[in-house]
Amino acid sequence: MNIRITGHQISLTAAIKRYVTRKLIRLNRKFNHQMNFSCVLEVNKLSKKVEVTTHLPGKDIHVQVENKDMYTAIDLLVAKIDRQIVKYKELHLINMHSAKISD
């Protein structure tokens, strides 16, 4: 697994990097293949924004969340990307099964 974390207008502390890495590793454990994540943390005047992009076979998933608290934004983002990956996996399995049945 490869995780690239960058910050815009924020100094990335070891605690934030560790927190993001730990959350994304949990996502990787759920799925069978190697995943690469690109994470951008950004601080605006009133809110914190977190973006993650990952590449799956046949699809790129991009998720963006804004919140007042950085750690809450990370938690919300991980929940969102988890739902999108599960949806992708379910559709991928349905397509695989329908292809086998039609043969």
Give the predicted meaning of each segment.
Residues M1-D103:
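N-terminal, polar/charged subdomain of small-to-medium soluble alpha/beta proteins
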